Amino acid sequence: MERYSNSTREVAQDGRRGALMLSVSIKHPDAEAFIDAKMTEGKVTGANVSVKIDDEFMQCAVEGKPYTQQFPIDSKEPQFTKDVDAKALWEKIVHNAWKSAEPGVLFWDTITRESIPDCYADLGFRTVSTNPCGEIPLCPYDSCRLLSINLYSYVVNPFTPEAYFDFDLFKKHVFMAQRIMDDIVDLELEKIDAIMAKINTDPQNDEVKGTEYHLWEKIKKKSGMGRRTGVGITAEGDMIAAMGLRYGTQEATDFSVSVHKTLALTAYRSSVEMAKERGAFEVFDAKREENNPFLLRIKDADAELYADIMKYGRRNIACLTIAPTGTTSLMTQTTSGIEPVFLPVYKRRRKVNPNDEAVHVDYVDEVGDSFEEYIVYHKKFMTWMEVNGYDTTKKYTQEEIDHLVAKSPYYKATANDVDWLMKVKMQGAIQKWVDHSISVTVNLPNDVDEQLVNRLYVEAWRSGCKGCTIYRAAACGTILRCSP
């Protein structure tokens, strides 16, 4: 693990650092050592770690029964078996997540049961892990292609009593987004051809460059066979607020589900239409997929679409995801992914020269450096202020800011004070309409206990989430700071 982690830290491309997900099945006899791998400070810092947990283990943990680990984990005649206390091992997972934010949990039976690509497991599409942020469960050599649609941009008259969501425009754009993603697959294949051509002209002998060439061969084959895409969203939190709803309420969850259901049906319709024009993905077989739980939900919602899938196939083996969209949300100036706003208003500090006349020193640190504090407003909170007639240029006191937030739809709907259990239930409800997975972090205050983490993880499993991660403030030092 340390070697993989260090290798990832050493890799960079165009200023971007490497990313890595390490995962191990709870059924593996070394699972406990894996769970403890990041408890020592400075260890495995170049990777995210998650445990692949099956339904049998969860049931044993909840009921206090023993659980059998084995190696090989999928063998009918394993070389080694070991009975473990499932409840104690589960409590260790919970404790470590509470203390260090890792490991995350991947509910593996839910992932594989719901996975359309796993209908083709014997053809090389057996899911083995996820991409680094967990939003796309992947088979070997496949690619993680992401596109995010800004949900806030479809709210007409945001933050007013007349606010509504433009479903017609949304469906039009989702339909086009799926086509763009399919074009991106072709672009990727062209780039792979160029890479392989370059390898062929390299001066090294075939024995040296053969390993890299054959790796790209496998990636190209898998990408072309499945044409997997990842159409997703960002700005869910801002969309909910702009509609006059509060994140974490049942009303907001129901509305979000309707949006994601529309997205799923439209993206799949687009993929079917492309199958008619361009051909279905290479290994499509209606008989293999007809009883997949995700497709059966599509059948219940739109019988005609399901019938067309069975008749014409799809251009893409799977279409949807919800990524963290951290950088994307900076560009759109919105909340990220399906997350609530982290804080609508917060303070930042900038270092200043105390000898400058125009400077106001608000803080001096332990080494004597002077800082000026300034208020940062979430952009869509400022939009709410403008719509409701508040002066966005005024320098408000903290008391006035608290009063403004309390009157806004962001009140009690930030990362640290949202109803966390309801947030997990919302993730599970939306997951029913996302064929891949959803990357979510449940942010918690520093003073919560391990029992809450336990409740959240168990609820995530019961709600149908494919994975879950929690982050308790200051669990990993001072990565995040909140100032009153």
Model feature map: region roles:
Residues Q70-P72, H173-K220, G224, R246-T325, ...:
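Internal maturation/activation junctions in enzymes
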Residues S5, R9, A33, S148, ...:
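Contiguous, well-ordered alpha-helical segments that form the cores/surfaces of helical PPI scaffolds
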Residues R17-L22, D30, M243-E251, S437-V440, ...:
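Glycine-rich phosphate/pyrophosphate-binding loops
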